[in-house]
């Protein structure tokens, strides 16, 4: 089976540090790439990791704070210089198009590909993207500006056919696709061979949720329930709880609480305030509530 | 004496590489900081080098290609978060204000400081900035879009007074500033003590020229003649001479030729095309013409 993986390009917050670039991550599912947020330096991080973005067609922007979108112009320009031809789709609030279009006209007026904007309603939990193998849903978040997270759901794959059974029952090739989808096989003699004898189930589809930036917000719990991996912001620790409320960010402990209540399998924290030079403290605070927490780090790939 | 120094934050060209960020450098003269170009990631490089930009008041943008200005929004946002209060002056072509203003309004509408735009006429060689210790002149360059380099000239400092002479002639304190500026001293008895006896000359003022991006362009030679340090772009090697002409860039050899003809003291090359993984080849090509050439490198400080 192909694995789903998440590569963190940047998991700092508003101010970059020596370790962390602003928010950006690359999700790879079934040979497709999805970019989630695009802070300054995203294309530089990709270059540092040797990421070829030739399977990247869709970018999802959570909200219009600079640390989540200032890398778009550089990335698009570079795609132009690489003579990209495939359409590039950007999913974001409507304002982004208004801000980027004049810049695209000025700096990239001879682009070799189209940039297509799709408007997200950040207040609604709804399907915003779908292809044959993946669905993406918006997750309304609670932040100072309109903001939403993203739930990526792999679709159920076809069942695995048991090769010996094809031979045993002499199943013709043209029948196989439907059997993989769960159909029984009827022999020439009219005998019904139940699908369960011919196939084994496919892997459980992967689910990944990205929740940044947000205050502690329990309304997301039913949406992200049981995901294989949750990336949740942990800008502050409990020592800065007042500031986290004011700025509508979460503490590491709160990220752990959300993970626990939603029964997720793994939590990755990130979007750390630049004030924390020792991020292990943030990890420990989240782990005290939710054991299977991982410290998000730039230039690192996580299996989902 | 305080030294003048140049810190290269990025000396890559349009496409970043593992080694090089896009164009940006910080010039420090007499305790002031000047930023020259501001490609994507400039603030990240500053952070990586521990540069505090609290003496930075003026930014000079050579031209409006993304790799020379996409870092401005991130830098300005961060200055805002740091509660900067000092005015920030940006010297660039008029179009930059039109492009940045809507972004500033959207992303930084509550900035704690003013951003002031100054228009450069890139076709003219003229004084574009002056304070008590430094003058900056534009240097018209030859590129696909309006573009100019910058000549930074330190002003002549006061002469050094010889302390023993103050005591010997009993020179009152209030006379000292004018003697430092070259005046003779007249004793109470009417004796004229020539300035040359009382003082020694100050250091020769430093001159630095930044020339990027540009085709080989001999018209800059009289302007940059004899500078202590010339940063000249060397996007290509002679093997890509046709491409360098098409794109109006220089080869390393041409950078060396300009340095030689202008009789500069030191040449730093940069703005390397991403195709050259071994930049020593570029250095050697320039050195074959102009021996005192230095390879520009990101995150490196050069004395001027």
Could you say what each language-model-derived stretch is?
Chain A
Residues 7, 91, 116-121, 137-139, ...:
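General small-molecule cofactor/ligand-binding pocket signal
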Residues 1-49, 85-87, 150-152, 200-211, ...:
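Conserved beta-strand hairpin/beta-sheet module of binuclear metal-dependent hydrolase folds
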Residues 121-269, 280-284, 289:
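Metal-dependent phosphodiesterase/nuclease catalytic metal-binding core
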Residues 72-78, 277-285:
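Metal-dependent catalytic neighborhoods of phosphoester/phosphodiester hydrolases
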Residues 36-39, 56-64, 93, 208-214, ...:
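Active-site neighborhood of phospho(di)ester-bond hydrolases with catalytic His/Asp-centered motifs
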Residues 84-88, 93-121:
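Active-site neighborhood of divalent metal-dependent phosphoester bond hydrolases
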Residues 6, 37, 46, 63, ...:
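Divalent metal-coordination and catalytic microenvironments
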